[in-house]
């Protein structure tokens, strides 16, 4: 991919959608780009689409193209822990400019 906005988690095989992107948020832009995706996967046994999931992907721009370098799939439990921990750190002033003095 040459353009950050064109990066997707969607995947098809022989015209069948196996991974469907439901949304994305570009967290960082530049030579290293981080994107949070919301997606769902097709269950190969039933053929039905599964429940929504979340994934964090990091891409590196090299020779004008973005290549996936890291991938973290977040379970519901991991997502809740991540949210609550970040919220706690923000509430306690442990992130951002105020945290530099601590």
Model-derived regions: residue spans:
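Positively charged, low-complexity terminal tracts
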Residues: 1-102
């Amino acid at each position: 991919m040459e353009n950050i906005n064109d990066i997707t988690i969607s995947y098809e095989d022989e015209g069948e959608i196996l991974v469907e992107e439901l949304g994305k948020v570009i967290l960082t832009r530049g030579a290293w780009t981080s994107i949070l995706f919301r997606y769902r996967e097709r269950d190969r046994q039933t053929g039905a689409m599964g429940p929504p999931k979340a994934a964090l992907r990091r891409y590196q721009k090299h020779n004008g193209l973005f290549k996936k370098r890291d991938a973290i799939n977040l379970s519901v439990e991991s997502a809740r822990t991540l949210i609550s921990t970040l919220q706690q750190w923000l509430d306690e002033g442990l992130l951002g400019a105020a945290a530099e003095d601590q």
